[in-house]
Amino acid sequence: MSGHSKWATIKRKKAATDQKRGNLFTKLVKEITIAAKMGGGDPSGNPRLRLAIDTARANSMPMDNIQRAIKKGTGELEGATYEEITYEGYGPGGIAIIIETATDNRNRTVADIRHLMSRSGGSLGENGSVGWMFNRKGSIEVPKSAISEDDLMELLLDAGLEELESDDEQYYTVLTDVKDLEPVKKALEEAEIPFENAKMDMIPDNYVELDVEDARKALKLIDALENSDDAQAVYSNMDISESVMSALEEE
C-alpha cells in the first residue's frame, strides 16, 4: 500500500473516534470565514468558499451557521479577524510535520504548537524547513463500490486526474493539480459518482516508516496538534506498516 493511501486509511479510522464535532465546526467556520473574506461571499465565483461549504454540509453543519460564517468574512457581521500561519517541524522518528493554522493571536498559537511539539520529542523549525518535501494537491476519495478503476480513470482523465491510488481496500484516492480539483469534482457530480473528503492536501515526496514506539508517539502528537484550538490541518510524511498498526490497535 502506498504511503498516502495508508495514511488516508489511518486518518479515516482516527476521524471516527478522535474528532469532536464542536472542534470540527470551529475549524469549518474559520475556513468559511477566511474564504469569504479573501474571495467574496458568492461560492459560484469563489472555489475555496465553495469547497469549504461543501465540506461543512457533508459534516452536517446547519446552513444558518454557514451563512453567519460567510457574513463574518464579508464584514456583514462582526467577528474575529483570522490570520493564516503555517508552521513546520519534525516529530518522533524524524517525520516532517506541517501545521496550517488560522488564529487571532499568533503569539498564543506559536506557543501552543511549540509546547505540543517539544513535549512529544519533536521540534518546531523555521519556515521552509520541511515544506520543500511536500506538494500541494487536490485530493478526493471515491468508494470502490461505486465504480471500477478503469471507468473512474476514463471518467476523470480529461477533467484533470493526475494520479489514481487504489491500494486502500474501500476507497480510491484521486489526486489532482490544485486548479483541477473543482473540474474533477464536477465530473464526479455529473456522473453521479459518490465521493468523500474533497480537499486540498499536502502530499510528501517520500515517507518515513515508523516503529511501534515512534508511531505511538507520532499519532499522539498529531492528535494533539489536530485538536489544538488554532490548527486547521496537519500533514506529515509518516508511514505506518500493517504490522505496526496491528500492534498499536491491540494495545
From Swiss-Prot:
<dbReference type="GO" id="GO:0003677">
    <property type="term" value="F:DNA binding"/>
</dbReference>
<dbReference type="InterPro" id="IPR017856">
    <property type="entry name" value="Integrase-like_N"/>
</dbReference>
<dbReference type="InterPro" id="IPR029072">
    <property type="entry name" value="YebC-like"/>
</dbReference>
<dbReference type="GO" id="GO:0006355">
    <property type="term" value="P:regulation of DNA-templated transcription"/>
</dbReference>
<keyword id="KW-0804">Transcription</keyword>
<dbReference type="GO" id="GO:0005829">
    <property type="term" value="C:cytosol"/>
</dbReference>
<keyword id="KW-0238">DNA-binding</keyword>
<dbReference type="InterPro" id="IPR002876">
    <property type="entry name" value="Transcrip_reg_TACO1-like"/>
</dbReference>
<dbReference type="Pfam" id="PF01709">
    <property type="entry name" value="Transcrip_reg"/>
</dbReference>
<comment type="similarity">
    <text>Belongs to the TACO1 family.</text>
</comment>
<keyword id="KW-0963">Cytoplasm</keyword>
<protein>
    <recommendedName>
        <fullName>Probable transcriptional regulatory protein Cpar_0525</fullName>
    </recommendedName>
</protein>
<dbReference type="InterPro" id="IPR026564">
    <property type="entry name" value="Transcrip_reg_TACO1-like_dom3"/>
</dbReference>
<dbReference type="Pfam" id="PF20772">
    <property type="entry name" value="TACO1_YebC_N"/>
</dbReference>
<dbReference type="InterPro" id="IPR048300">
    <property type="entry name" value="TACO1_YebC-like_2nd/3rd_dom"/>
</dbReference>
<keyword id="KW-0805">Transcription regulation</keyword>
<dbReference type="InterPro" id="IPR049083">
    <property type="entry name" value="TACO1_YebC_N"/>
</dbReference>
